[in-house]
Curated annotation (Swiss-Prot):
Keyword Transmembrane among record annotations: yes
Induction per the UniProt record: Up-regulated in response to activation of unfolded protein response (UPR).
Binding site for ATP: 234, 316-319, 367-374, 399-400, 407
Originating species: Homo sapiens (Human)
Role description: Protein that can both mediate the addition of adenosine 5'-monophosphate (AMP) to specific residues of target proteins (AMPylation), and the removal of the same modification from target proteins (de-AMPylation), depending on the context. Acts as a key regulator of the ERN1/IRE1-mediated unfolded protein response (UPR) by mediating AMPylation or de-AMPylation of HSPA5/BiP.
EC code: 2.7.7.108, 3.1.4.-
Protein name: Protein adenylyltransferase FICD
Subunit (UniProt): Homodimer. Interacts with HD.
Transmembrane segments: 24-44
Effect of L258D: Abolishes homodimerization
Sorted UniProt keywords: ATP-binding, Disease variant, Endoplasmic reticulum, Glycoprotein, Hereditary spastic paraplegia, Hydrolase, Magnesium, Manganese, Membrane, Neurodegeneration, Nucleotide-binding, Nucleotidyltransferase, Phosphoprotein, Repeat, Signal-anchor, TPR repeat, Transferase, Transmembrane, Transmembrane helix, Unfolded protein response
Length: 458
């Protein structure tokens, strides 16, 4: 609305209805601003209380020997193909289909790579394999030959990933089928060993006395860090100290976005709900539980959409989630899976990671899907006796990359990523209480001479 200079008042006669409407708009705007400020000043439960709730939930699980024993022995039970390991792989996510010229260049690069390999120039060969797949990520022959190359370097995890990707594109590719039949049991063995290592660290954390002051301090710090990183992943610009200020003083940070500050309050409310209501509750996870988590996550930012499924189609990167008419049905199937024997027989980290991925794949909400999925993942971990984990904002690129790889057909890299985050959280807790970290097994053992790899993006 344009304000009229006082000198022009005599020259311009404003209709009465315009004046009334203007006052109505100003009152509405002022009410919205005051509402946001009041939300920031609402009493927030002490962070220490929430940390104690987490600790209480973890220690309550000690009184359930059957559940604890089940979690400890899951790693020895038959596993699905969704294995977990700390190692990375060359993740090849097809952004677009290769052009005819790109396919020709990829073919030429593959031929050169094979020639360099024959001559023993393996470093050059690797670069050429990577270039071929950069030009055409769906080039099945290049995927298979690069898998063979990786297997020769004892990089079994990467080789298996490449064979799997080739079979996703061409399910009856004979060479890829034969090679993957050879690598899959090896990968599963490596992954099962990693499960055992993670479980040994969980037992160490659970053996720390409840009253340990160092553990309480690090849990409190972890609480702040979790909120900071989970909102930062979504683009929130508040610093860790600003988030601490909001939660400790219950006052707004001057000059910073009220929406971003309300996101912090929403995360705090959702975590409080999980810690005090869901963690130690016996029974199935329901759609209502997921909606209640989301209602708190988004309630201070968008109360209209909070706690309700989206009614419009959305696009998430290169992923097109289900049509809004199918969301409720898919959520019912998702919750049915959450409470199924199949899911319960998975290792807790695998179960939590798959739940995260399945929920974010459905993308049932207009906003807040990532935060809600990460909270659900931590709920599952805590119910199994694990501490809540944090995906750091510095891992954002890798996090989204493995999600894209899962959308392309192989969810295992995503599960491995979550497993590594779990290990990092456990190491943080054990390092803070040093006496309990003695004689822990190395989390990334070089089993059977297999080579360590890092995620490499073409």
């Amino acid at each position: 609305m344009m304000l009229i200079p006082m000198a022009s008042v005599m020259a311009v006669t404003e209709p009465k209805w315009v004046s009334v409407w203007s006052r109505f708009l100003w009152v509405t705007l002022l009410s919205m601003v005051l509402g946001s400020l009041l939300a920031l000043l609402l009493p927030l439960g002490a962070v220490e209380e929430q940390c104690l709730a987490v600790l209480k939930g973890l220690y309550l699980l000690r009184s359930k020997p059957d559940r604890a024993q089940h979690a400890a022995t899951k790693c020895t039970s038959p596993s699905t193909e969704l294995s977990i390991t700390s190692r990375g792989a060359t993740l090849l996510v097809a952004k677009t289909k290769a052009s005819p010229a790109g396919k020709l260049e990829a073919r030429a690069a593959l031929n050169q790579a094979l020639e360099m390999k024959r001559q023993g120039k393996r470093e050059k060969a690797q670069k050429l394999f990577m270039h071929a797949l950069k030009m055409d990520p769906d080039f099945v022959d290049a995927l298979t030959e690069f898998g063979i190359f990786s297997e020769e370097d004892k990089d079994i995890i990467q080789a298996d990933y490449l064979y799997t990707r080739a079979l996703t594109i061409s399910p009856y590719h004979e060479k890829a089928l034969v090679n993957r039949d050879r690598t899959l049991p090896l990968v599963e063995e490596i992954d099962q060993r990693y499960f055992s290592i993670i479980d040994s660290k969980v037992k160490k954390v659970m053996s720390i006395p409840k009253g340990n002051s160092a553990l309480r301090r690090v849990m409190e710090e972890t609480y702040y860090h979790h909120i900071y990183h989970t909102v930062a992943i979504e683009g929130n610009t508040l610093t860790l100290s600003e988030i601490r200020h909001i939660l400790e003083t219950r006052y707004a940070v001057p000059g910073k976005s009220l929406e971003e500050q309300n996101e912090v309050i929403g995360m705090h409310a959702a975590m409080k709900y999980i810690n005090t209501t869901l963690v130690s509750r016996i029974g199935s996870v329901t759609i209502s539980d997921v909606l209640e988590i989301h209602r708190r996550v988004l309630g201070y930012v968008d109360p209209v959409e909070a706690g309700r499924f989206r009614t419009t189609q959305v696009l998430v990167g290169h992923h097109i989630p289900p049509h809004p008419q199918d969301v409720e049905k898919q959520m019912q199937e998702f919750v049915q899976w959450l409470n199924s024997e199949e899911a319960m027989n998975l290792h807790p980290v695998e179960f939590a990671a798959l739940a995260h991925y399945k929920l974010v794949y459905i993308h049932p909400f207009i906003d807040g899907n990532g935060r809600t999925s990460r909270l659900l993942m931590n709920l599952i971990l805590m119910q199994a006796g694990y501490p809540p984990i944090t995906i750091r904002k510095e891992q954002r690129s890798d996090y989204y990359h493995v999600l894209e790889a899962a959308n392309e057909g192989d969810v295992r890299p995503f599960i491995r990523f979550i497993a590594k985050c779990t290990e990092t959280t456990l190491d943080t807790l054990l390092f803070a209480t040093t006496e309990y970290s003695v004689a822990l097994p190395e989390a990334q053992p070089n089993h059977s001479g297999f080579k360590e790899t890092l995620p490499v993006k073409p």
